[in-house]
Curated annotation (Swiss-Prot):
GO terms for molecular function: NADH dehydrogenase (ubiquinone) activity. Belongs to the complex I subunit 3 family. It is an enzyme of class 7 (translocase). This is NADH-ubiquinone oxidoreductase chain 3. It is found in: Mitochondrion inner membrane. It is a multi-pass membrane protein. Its EC number is 7.1.1.2. It comes from Pan troglodytes (Chimpanzee).
Amino acid sequence: MNFVLILMTNTLLALLLMIITFWLPQLNSYMEKSTPYECGFDPMSPARVPFSMKFFLVAITFLLFDLEIALLLPLPWALQTANLPLMVTSSLLLITILALSLAYEWLQKGLDWTE
């Protein structure tokens, strides 16, 4: 009985709040307030603005390295495998590829977006 009373009270309170919000008028509604918010961008500016290709390449590089780091996360659980030499070899190969690709990006100035 107590649970039913709590459930009905919460339902009635939710319905009352929904009815109140639908009946109250929208105050201060103007064009910019009714547009969706896009973090940091002016919603009234033109849509075709130039985009930094260097920043885009750094973002793609970050996504690739983030994916490789996600591949490294299950390595502690992989130590429990029966075929330990194969697991160690494959993990060292993955870490070597990650280090070499980071060195390549660094030498090619792919991580500097200020230039």
